[in-house]
Amino acid sequence: MRIAGVDLPSQKKLEVALTYLYGIGKTLAKEILEACQLSPDLRVRDVNDEQSMRLRQYIEQKYLIESDLKRVESMNIKRLMDIGCYRGRRHRALLPVRGQRTRSNARTRRGAKKTVAGKKLAK
């Protein structure tokens, strides 16, 4: 089954397979299946065409997923950078945005360590 350009793995249960879509986690997958009146234990390969269409239409109408969601997220970050707010400046400087410390740690955001030579002691 294919939703929003993503092939869902046929051997997985529907609840797990939906999490392969960017923007859909376990909780949202459960809600979607409940709204579409599908069993979470149903395997993707066992879903018939009618159920598949119902699921696809529900997801596309109700939620932003995959490239649409990524585009909205990147536009939100770009907007923050354009208006020059604190969060935008942190994004632009590639520093942690949510108040994490940077004196130590923050290696994920800042990249590999760049060693700076210490001061020489006078003798």
UniProtKB/Swiss-Prot annotation:
Belongs to the universal ribosomal protein uS13 family. One of its GO terms (molecular function) is structural constituent of ribosome. It comes from Cyanidioschyzon merolae (strain NIES-3377 / 10D). Keywords: Chloroplast, Plastid, Ribonucleoprotein, Ribosomal protein, RNA-binding, rRNA-binding. Residues 99-123 are annotated as: Disordered. PROSITE patterns: RIBOSOMAL_S13_1 (PS00646), RIBOSOMAL_S13_2 (PS50159). It is found in: Plastid, Chloroplast. This is Small ribosomal subunit protein uS13c. Located at the top of the head of the 30S subunit, it contacts several helices of the 16S rRNA. Residues 100-123 have a biased composition (Basic residues). The gene is rps13. It comes from the Eukaryota. GO terms for biological process: translation. Its main location: plastid. One of its GO terms (cellular component) is small ribosomal subunit. Part of the 30S ribosomal subunit.
